[in-house]
């Protein structure tokens, strides 16, 4: 059993696909990108903050001591950093800009327990061209 410190339906779906038992854990943080260091630094920093907040919330609410998994993904194309879309229209605009372009998808991952935490980052992808109906 683990706690997932994320509101991402995709992260929950991925854990279900690999048969990991998990409980969702509240881990609200200010998700503003810090414009210091690399995008990878930012993704890792946000993942660590989510994990730490999740652990604090679990302790404060007397939950059992299970590992906490948190992640944050940042997309980078050229000099532009894409954060979370603010609406479905914003998501459509972002996907349209990325469609057919090579860009980086950087995910910071943090796993922690009451007394320790580990974080890492990974991945570059090539994106195929998307048709308008595929982004809806």
Predicted regions and their residues:
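Single conserved hydrophobic/aromatic residue that forms the stacking wall/gate
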Residues: 129-136
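Ordered, amphipathic secondary-structure segments that act as subunit-interaction surfaces
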Residues: 67-73
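Short, structured loop/turn "capping" segments at alpha-beta junctions
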Residues: 101-106, 116-121
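Short acidic-glycine loop/turn motifs at beta-strand connectors
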Residues: 77-78, 113-117
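Short beta-strand and adjoining strand-loop segment in the mid-core
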Residues: 80-83, 110, 122-127
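Residue-level signal for inorganic ion chemistry
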Residues: 15, 47, 72, 91, ...
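Active-site-adjacent loop/tail segments of enzyme domains
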Residues: 42, 73-103
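N-terminal polybasic phosphate/anion-binding patch
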Residues: 1-67, 80-81
């Amino acid at each position: 059993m683990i706690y997932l410190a994320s509101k991402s339906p995709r992260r929950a779906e991925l854990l279900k696909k690999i048969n990991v038992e998990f409980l969702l854990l509240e881990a609200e943080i200010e998700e503003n990108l810090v414009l210091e260091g690399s995008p990878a630094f930012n993704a890792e920093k946000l993942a660590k903050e989510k994990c730490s907040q999740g652990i604090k919330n679990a302790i404060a609410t007397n939950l059992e001591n299970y590992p906490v998994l948190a992640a944050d993904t940042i997309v980078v194309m050229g000099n532009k950093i894409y954060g979370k879309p603010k609406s479905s229209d914003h998501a459509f605009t972002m996907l349209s800009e990325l469609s057919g372009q090579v860009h980086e998808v950087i995910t910071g991952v943090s796993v922690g327990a009451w007394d320790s935490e580990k974080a890492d980052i990974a991945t570059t992808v090539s994106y195929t061209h998307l048709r308008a109906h595929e982004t809806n």
